[in-house]
């Protein structure tokens, strides 16, 4: 008799995704981040659900309801901090996952890659709206500044911003709709993640060498389930260390002050995971130019597959490209640092140089390095 997991319509899907999935035998720990992102998403949905049971999306009570969750709800403080720091862990895993895709040439799976970019956009939108909900100073001013950027769009800009706000400023209507969107988007992310997996399983996983591994596949379970469990344990350990010992390390002290439209904080800045894009936005003096650069800093990922000029898929055997990849990582870390600094000398010029380098490396230097490597290997 055939095993039920191979015949039952529902079990068959689970079996083909997590148990009997043919997987390359040589994938490294960099391939752990997909499952870690799944764990992060489930964790965020669960903690978010419990927070939503006690939160009120009204400008007069939102801040107090978050305080109430932390002080009066049983284990409310741990749920709140797991949700806030869980978002940081989510983005750490996201950046590692994207970095892995860039390094090993996983972007040649076009559908999987493009849905991944869409997932990144959706996650960023969700995180931004979530940051507005506690209705602290940085929540209010962050929402005002970022939504106001849309007013740079010619002709329809101002109307669009007022339509998003639901009035002439960020107010009750804005908070209510942000809560509604913040609640629904994670489920859309979950659906997109399933489509992401569907397309991945059409082609099978890439591997560090970038060479097709159809001749050497092993079942996902038990080899990679045990590896994923180790990764998940380390992720939860890191998250709980953050939650229990340094819950406010990655937050902003200004968000412990209730929102006040009459008092602007000295330095308006988003959460750390948006700082690189914020630095690119600020590096251009023109408003529309800044908005375009901000959008392009993420949209550029869609162009990466078309900029691949190497005869090899992975960077494993391409030292010049490897070097440029790590320069890009250093550049992104520089942008993240600059995004958190005030707009004054020397930060402005450093931010502008780092922004130019970011686009230059992706659009010009890396494709050129690949062509040089092809020629060095006599691959015309």
From Swiss-Prot:
> Which Gene3D superfamilies does this chain map to?
Cytochrome Bc1 Complex, Chain C (1.20.810.10)
Record's keyword annotation contains Metal-binding: yes
**Key words, A-Z:** Electron transport, Heme, Iron, Membrane, Metal-binding, Mitochondrion, Mitochondrion inner membrane, Respiratory chain, Transmembrane, Transmembrane helix, Transport, Ubiquinone
- Family matches, as CDD domains: cytochrome_b_C, Cytochrome_b_N
Its domain of life reads: Eukaryota
Matches recorded under Pfam families: Cytochrom_B_C (PF00032), Cytochrome_B (PF00033)
Q: What does this protein do?
A: Component of the ubiquinol-cytochrome c reductase complex (complex III or cytochrome b-c1 complex) that is part of the mitochondrial respiratory chain. The b-c1 complex mediates electron transfer from ubiquinol to cytochrome c. Contributes to the generation of a proton gradient across the mitochondrial membrane that is then used for ATP synthesis.
Sites where the protein binds heme b b562:
83, 182
Q: Which GO terms describe its molecular function?
A: metal ion binding; ubiquinol-cytochrome-c reductase activity
Annotated protein name in UniProt: Cytochrome b
Work out whether the entry's keyword set contains Iron: yes
Q: Which family does it belong to?
A: Belongs to the cytochrome b family.
Q: Where does a ubiquinone bind?
A: 201
């Amino acid at each position: 008799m055939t095993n039920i997991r191979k015949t039952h319509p529902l079990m068959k899907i689970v079996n083909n995704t997590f148990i009997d999935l043919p997987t390359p035998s040589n994938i490294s720990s960099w391939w752990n981040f997909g499952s870690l992102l799944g764990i992060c998403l489930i964790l965020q949905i669960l903690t978010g659900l419990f927070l939503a049971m006690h939160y009120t999306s009204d400008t007069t009570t939102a801040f107090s309801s978050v305080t109430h969750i932390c002080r009066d709800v049983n284990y409310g403080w741990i749920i709140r901090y797991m949700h806030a720091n869980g978002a940081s862990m989510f983005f750490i895993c996201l950046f590692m996952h994207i970095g892995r895709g860039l390094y090993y040439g996983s972007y040649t799976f076009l559908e999987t890659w493009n849905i991944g970019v869409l997932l990144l956009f959706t996650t960023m939108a969700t995180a931004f709206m979530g940051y507005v909900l506690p209705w602290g100073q940085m929540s209010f001013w962050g929402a005002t500044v970022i939504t106001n950027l849309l007013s740079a769009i010619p002709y329809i800009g101002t109307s669009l911003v007022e339509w998003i706000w639901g009035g002439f400023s960020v107010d009750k209507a804005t908070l209510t709709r942000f809560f509604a969107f913040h609640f629904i988007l994670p489920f859309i992310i979950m659906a997109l993640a399933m489509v992401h997996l569907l397309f991945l399983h059409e082609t099978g996983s890439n591997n560090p060498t970038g060479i097709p591994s159809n001749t050497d596949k092993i079942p996902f379970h038990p080899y990679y389930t045990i590896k994923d469990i180790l990764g998940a344990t380390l992720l939860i350990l890191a998250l709980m260390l953050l939650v229990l010992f340094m819950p406010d390390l990655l937050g902003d002290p200004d968000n412990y002050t209730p929102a006040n439209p009459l008092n602007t904080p000295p330095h308006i800045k988003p959460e750390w995971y948006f700082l690189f894009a914020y630095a690119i936005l600020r590096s251009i003096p023109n408003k529309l130019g800044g908005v375009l650069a901000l959008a392009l800093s993420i949209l550029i990922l869609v162009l990466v597959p078309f900029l691949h000029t190497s005869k090899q898929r992975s960077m494993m055997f391409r030292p010049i490209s490897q070097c440029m990849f790590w320069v890009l990582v250093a550049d992104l870390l520089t942008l993240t640092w600059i995004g958190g600094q005030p707009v004054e000398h020397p930060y402005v010029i450093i931010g502008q140089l780092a922004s130019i380098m970011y686009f230059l490396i992706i659009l010009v230097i890396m494709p050129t390095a690949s062509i040089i490597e092809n020629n060095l290997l006599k691959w015309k």
